[in-house]
């Protein structure tokens, strides 16, 4: 299993239910993937059974399901050799591979203004503990789900201004409605940052109205940048795996163009796919069942846990 985000962790658990021995390789230093890295406090609302659950609690529950699976963190997969089986980085010999890397290796898109080392200390691209910003004046730059979630979370403990280059936000409809109803968040739209300097331990940022000449000045103790991430799953192309618009192409069994290599979650793409965790959980079951049928064609496979 390559990737220890929610979908990868669930796939490892489901593989265990079928008696498969699994090793999970994760490039980050801790499991949980992008949800745990970017917004562990976020309430996830679209996972069946839970009316809401935080990313951190979801990770804890998924980890609690693991028993004899080996979890290796801080290991970025680079090499793959194919003989009768697969050999990963000259160390792990496996019969099948499931790629569950989400958007792959990701780097935050940087704040567009040149920052001195002193200014960099006030610029953040992710955080785990909201209390670090309590009582401060916070600027959040971005207009997607992450920016909206951060704004609503921090508005409970800080003075928050959300700056976006458009009047419309890209987040989920319910998040946009909640934001507009949250009188604790000051909205600055449509504005882009024009210049920045540090004065008396704070960031002074000039904001220019998009399509106009108006320039305003804002002072922040800290800013959070949610301009998205540059994702990269191209490492699998070195293995001969086909990509489609940057995503791993799969068939109906979640198998890639290379027999024995499967892809699930946001790492893969096919017509009509929706990038939500719940879909990834279903894809994990499809991939594991396909692997079982490939490795043990003589077995009568129990498809689901409620089979009689």
Curated annotation (Swiss-Prot):
Positions that bind FAD: 26, 34, 39, 77, 106, 266, 306
Top-level taxon: Bacteria
Gene Ontology MF terms in the entry: ferredoxin-NADP+ reductase activity; flavin adenine dinucleotide binding; NADP binding
Enzyme class: oxidoreductase
EC number annotated for this UniProt entry: 1.18.1.2
Reaction(s) this enzyme catalyzes, per UniProt: 2 reduced [2Fe-2S]-[ferredoxin] + NADP(+) + H(+) = 2 oxidized [2Fe-2S]-[ferredoxin] + NADPH
Listed SUPFAM superfamilies: FAD/NAD(P)-binding domain
Cofactors that this protein relies on: FAD
Family annotation (InterPro entries): FAD/NAD-bd_sf (IPR036188), FAD/NAD-binding_dom (IPR023753), Fd--NADP_Rdtase_type_2 (IPR022890), Ferredoxin-NADP_redctase_2 (IPR050097)
Pfam family, one: Pyr_redox_2
Gene3D superfamilies xrefs: FAD/NAD(P)-binding domain
Cofactor note: Binds 1 FAD per subunit.
Record keywords, A-Z: FAD, Flavoprotein, NADP, Oxidoreductase
Subunit record text: Homodimer.
Family classification: Belongs to the ferredoxin--NADP reductase type 2 family.
HAMAP family linked: FENR2
Protein name: Ferredoxin--NADP reductase
């Amino acid at each position: 299993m390559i990737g220890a985000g929610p979908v990868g962790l669930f796939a490892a658990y489901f593989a265990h239910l079928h008696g498969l021995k699994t090793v999970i390789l994760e490039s980050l230093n801790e499991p949980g993937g992008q949800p745990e890295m970017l917004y562990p406090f976020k309430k996830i609302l679209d996972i069946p059974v839970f009316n809401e659950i935080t990313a951190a609690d979801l990770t804890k529950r998924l980890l609690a399901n693991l028993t004899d699976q080996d979890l290796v963190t801080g290991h970025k997969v680079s090499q793959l050799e194919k003989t009768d089986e697969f050999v990963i980085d000259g160390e792990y010999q496996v019969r099948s591979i499931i790629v569950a890397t989400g958007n792959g290796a990701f780097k935050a898109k940087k704040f567009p203004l040149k920052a001195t080392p002193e200014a960099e200390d006030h610029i953040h691209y992710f955080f785990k503990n909201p209390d670090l910003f309590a009582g401060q004046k916070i600027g959040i730059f971005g207009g997607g789900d992450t920016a909206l979630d951060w704004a609503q979370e921090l508005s409970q403990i800080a003075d928050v201004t959300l700056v976006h280059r458009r009047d419309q936000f890209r987040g989920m409809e319910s998040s946009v409605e909640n934001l507009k109803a949250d009188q604790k968040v000051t909205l600055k739209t449509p504005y882009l940052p024009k210049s920045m300097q540090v004065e008396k331990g704070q960031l002074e940022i000039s904001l220019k109205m998009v399509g106009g000449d108006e320039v305003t000045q804002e002072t922040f103790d800290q800013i959070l940048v949610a301009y998205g991430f540059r994702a990269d799953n191209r490492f699998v192309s070195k293995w001969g795996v086909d990509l489609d618009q940057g995503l791993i192409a799969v068939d109906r069994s979640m198998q890639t163009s290379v027999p024995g290599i499967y892809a699930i979650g946001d790492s893969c793409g096919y017509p009509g796919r929706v990038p939500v965790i719940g879909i990834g959980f279903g894809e994990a079951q499809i991939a594991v069942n396909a692997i079982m049928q490939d490795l043990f064609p003589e077995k009568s496979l129990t498809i689901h846990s409620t089979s009689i």
